[in-house]
Amino acid sequence: MLRQCARWVLTRTRFGRGCRRYGSCSPSASGDAGEARAYFTTPIFYVNAAPHIGHLYSALLADALCRHRRLRVPGSASTRFSTGTDEHGLKIQQAAATAGLAPIELCDRVSAQFLQLFREADISSTDFIRTTEARHRVAVQHFWGVLEARGLLYKGIYEGWYCASDECFLPEAKVTRQVGPSGDPCPVSLESGHPVSWTKEENYIFKLSQFREPLQRWLGNNPQAITPEPFHQAVLQWLEEELPDLSVSRRSSHLHWGIPVPGDDSQTIYVWLDALVNYLTVVGYPDADFKSWWPATSHIIGKDILKFHAIYWPALLLGAGLRPPHRIYVHSHWTVSGQKMSKSLGNVVDPRTCLDRYTVDGFRYFLLRQGVPNWDCDYYDEKVVKLLDSELADALGGLLNRCTAYRINPSGTYPSFCAACFPSEPGLTGPSVRVQAEDYALVTAVATLPKLVAGYYNDFQIYKALEAVSSCVRQTNGFVQRHAPWKLNWESPEDAPWLGTVLHVALECLRVFGTLLQPVTPNLADKLLSRLGVSTTERGLGELYFLPRFYGHPCPFEGRKLGPDTGLLFPRLDQSRTRLVKAHRT
């Protein structure tokens, strides 16, 4: 395996620097499949309540995917990332009335909370869209006009179960009965558990029934369109059932806080259709330039809105003559001590408190390290402290401190690598050879780590990418512990070459870890790489040529002065910061 790894690096070296890129050599690992542009989106978040950690988790997943793509494909012009707020609908209309505010006043207030949270959490979005913006109204009404011109909308009586909380109609199969507070049967949504009522009114209706087979073909031809796989299969299963036509408007007398149907002020466009079009608004729809970004789109969404994004939205796009999005990444939810977050339970965790308590990078790392898209993840404060102290403070921070401490590295430089001490061929012997079999396993693991991590990002398994990095950090600590550089003497002709080699290998490993952690912990990674003396132009995946001296090539860092010591990489969370994060009660 080591010889294969060496050949992999050396082959690319013969063709020049640009071919030594771990992240961009393999399209399957990059996730871009050769596309020149990439457009990442979060859902736009409903402004009926303050943001919670589930909202932040969606934004962090998108942010990490986007940042990793920027490491692979330098140049901000090729990557776009949007988030924002969903501000129309009956719930906003009612919440504003209850608060004694105009709807736009409520929207301004809560949208600002989301914007502030994302700034504090270092979400690197390029666009923040609000559905109350004039540009969005233009896009929605144009999109409606295209559907109408294509004969896909008709006016009729729509009758069925309506869920006010979810603002959607439900077929009979998606409704069940539960015993209500009065002891009587109460109809509720099977999917959300929210109450439903029978509603009959005249609406505009979209011919969704025409798109069942086109959607099945789309998913059949694009097996990675929806990730993870269980959600892809769930959508295929939904499509085995009949797709009834879909109401896409409400009476203006009932819902006035929204975008009017063009040419018919008696109807307001349904909030979920209005909201979905935001992805087109951001890239300039209906102007022709939007096609340079569409459909190179990756939607990051929660599982509760899967049907809207994986059935309704692709059908609407196909109906408008547009291609469905490139990828839909789906994640599950966060619970608190095993319970769903709820204002009524008083267990909604305030993400801004967590960012302050555990640091921005610490809380980013926790959510992305512990969050598994396939199933719900449980939050409790002790878990945060244990993870961050173990992996960031002790393992990673301790490794950096060991290798840069004055006692072990008095010159404050990137020491030289001695090929005689650490030959590239395992099993060689000689008076200078001190390497052990486990050390070759470490080199192989770290050399292949960037490609492994790229594959995990492509598969929407960021938690596995961080698990792989953490595993290599542990291996590197084992390497340092095994060879105990603090017991070696720089003044000894026998010790000095091996001491320099041990530190060189460990610092090279740290450089890889710092580079790969940039999408998740940008500030911590910057601090680590700056301490190693790695300039900002040497931090992309194209520059991540690991341990070149091992393969007989020059190392640009050898002999370079380390950067300034700015203190602990990540201080352990002391008792004053381990108090339970109080629930944000509203």
Swiss-Prot record:
UniProt cross-references to CDD domains, sorted A to Z: Anticodon_Ia_Met, MetRS_core
Catalytic activity from the UniProt record: tRNA(Met) + L-methionine + ATP = L-methionyl-tRNA(Met) + AMP + diphosphate
Chief location bin: mitochondrion
InterPro entries in the cross-refs: Anticodon_Met, Met-tRNA_synth, Met-tRNA_synth_2, Methionyl/Leucyl_tRNA_Synth, MetRS_core, Rossmann-like_a/b/a_fold, tRNAsynth_Ia_anticodon-bd
Subcellular location: Mitochondrion matrix
A single MF term (Gene Ontology): ATP binding
UniProt keyword terms in alphabetical order: Aminoacyl-tRNA synthetase, ATP-binding, Ligase, Mitochondrion, Nucleotide-binding, Protein biosynthesis, Transit peptide
A GO cellular-component term linked to this record: mitochondrion
Binding site for ATP: K343
Motif mapping: 'HIGH' region: 45-55
Transit peptide: 1-46
EC assignment: 6.1.1.10
Gene Ontology biological process terms in this record: methionyl-tRNA aminoacylation
Motif stretch ('KMSKS' region): 340-344
SUPFAM superfamilies cross-referenced by the UniProt entry: Anticodon-binding domain of a subclass of class I aminoacyl-tRNA synthetases, Nucleotidylyl transferase
Family (UniProt): Belongs to the class-I aminoacyl-tRNA synthetase family.
Name by which UniProt lists this protein: Methionine--tRNA ligase, mitochondrial
